[in-house]
């Protein structure tokens, strides 16, 4: 690798919306995420609807599912 052309690789704290935090390495010092392995339905086995900008409500209204 060439010297002084690569970004600095530092410790990073990743924070999930559920409150879970963990450490990793990145060129950023802090990363915020919406879903992690502690709250993702695949890993927890529970159902959780992830709504992006009201898409679920729009779908329910369109097909009268309320």
UniProtKB/Swiss-Prot annotation:
Keyword Metal-binding: yes
Molecular functions per Gene Ontology: metal ion binding; rRNA binding; structural constituent of ribosome
Gene3D superfamilies: Ribosomal protein L31 (4.10.830.30)
Cofactor: Zn(2+)
PROSITE patterns: RIBOSOMAL_L31
Note on cofactor: Binds 1 zinc ion per subunit.
Alphabetical UniProt keywords: Metal-binding, Ribonucleoprotein, Ribosomal protein, RNA-binding, rRNA-binding, Zinc
Entry binding sites for Zn(2+): 16, 18, 36, 39
GO BP annotations, alphabetical order: translation
InterPro entries listed in its UniProt record: Ribosomal_bL28/bL31-like_sf, Ribosomal_bL31, Ribosomal_bL31_A, Ribosomal_bL31_sf
GO cellular component labels: ribonucleoprotein complex; ribosome
Pfam families: Ribosomal_L31
Quaternary structure, from the entry: Part of the 50S ribosomal subunit.
PANTHER family xref list: 50S RIBOSOMAL PROTEIN L31, CHLOROPLASTIC, LARGE RIBOSOMAL SUBUNIT PROTEIN BL31A
Chain's role: Binds the 23S rRNA.
Family: Belongs to the bacterial ribosomal protein bL31 family. Type A subfamily.
HAMAP family: Ribosomal_bL31_1 (MF_00501)
Protein name: Large ribosomal subunit protein bL31
Provenance organism: Campylobacter curvus (strain 525.92)
